[in-house]
C-alpha cells in the first residue's frame, strides 16, 4: 500500500517565538508536520532553560513535534588537551553541538516518516516560499530555494 507523501518542516529552536509563529503561518497550508528541536545547551556549551512553549501555538499544536536535546555531544574537544587555539576549539565544538541537534531531528524523521516524504530543513528565519512550488509533484531528490533576504530587528 502506497503511503501518502508528507511534507515536514524542521528547525532547531533557540528563542525566536515571533519568528517561529511567522514561519508556522506562512508554511501551514503547505506542510503536514513541523519538527522543532531545542537543546538544553547553547552552541557555546552554556546550560540554558527551554524557551519553546507549545501553548503559544495552539492553532498548530497538532502538527508540531517538539524534541528536547538533554545531552551534549560525546565527541567535544577539551580546551586543555587540544593543541588548537581556544577560538578554533570553540567553533568546532559549536558545530558539533549543532550537528548533534540536527541528528536528533534525523532520528525522529527516520522513526516516523517515509523515504518518499519531503523534508525541509532550514534556520527559523530561512522560510521557503512554497506558494508557487508543489513539492508533491516534484521529481527531484533535492531542491534548493532562492530566498529574499531581509534585515530586521524585532522589539519584544
Question: Positions of the model-derived regions?
Answer:
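N-proximal low-complexity "stem/linker" segments adjacent to membrane-targeting elements
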Residues: 2-29
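Short, conserved active-site loop motifs that form the nucleotide-linked donor/cofactor pocket
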Residues: 7, 64, 142
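Short catalytic/ligand-binding loop motif for oxyanion handling, primarily in non-cytosolic enzymes
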Residues: 18-19, 42-46, 74-77, 127-131, ...
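Short, well-ordered alpha-helix to beta-strand connector turns
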Residues: 31, 61, 116, 139-140
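Short beta-strand-to-loop acidic/aromatic patch adjacent to the donor-nucleotide binding site
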Residues: 34, 113-128, 133
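Short internal beta-strands
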Residues: 35-39
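Active-site-proximal specificity loops/subdomain of glycosyltransferases
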Residues: 41-118
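Conserved catalytic core of nucleotide-sugar-dependent glycosyltransferases
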Residues: 95, 126-156
Amino acid at each position: 500500500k502506497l503511503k501518502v507523501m508528507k511534507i515536514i518542516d524542521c528547525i532547531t529552536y533557540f528563542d525566536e517565538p515571533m519568528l517561529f509563529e511567522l514561519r508556522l503561518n506562512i508554511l501551514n497550508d503547505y506542510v503536514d508536520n513541523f519538527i522543532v528541536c531545542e537543546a538544553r545547551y547553547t552552541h557555546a556549551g552554556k546550560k540554558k532553560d527551554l524557551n519553546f512553549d507549545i501553548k503559544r501555538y495552539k492553532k498548530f499544536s497538532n502538527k508540531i513535534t517538539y524534541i528536547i536535546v538533554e545531552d551534549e555531544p560525546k565527541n567535544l574537544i577539551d580546551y586543555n588537551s587540544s593543541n588548537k587555539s581556544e577560538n578554533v576549539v570553540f567553533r568546532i565544538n559549536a558545530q558539533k553541538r549543532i550537528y548533534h541537534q540536527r541528528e536528533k531531528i534525523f532520528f525522529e524523521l527516520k522513526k516516523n516518516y517515509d523515504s518518499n516524504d519531503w523534508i525541509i530543513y532550514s534556520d527559523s528565519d530561512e522560510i521557503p516560499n512554497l506558494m508557487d512550488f508543489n513539492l508533491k509533484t516534484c521529481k527531484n531528490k533535492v531542491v534548493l530555494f532562492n530566498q529574499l533576504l531581509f534585515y530586521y530587528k524585532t522589539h519584544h
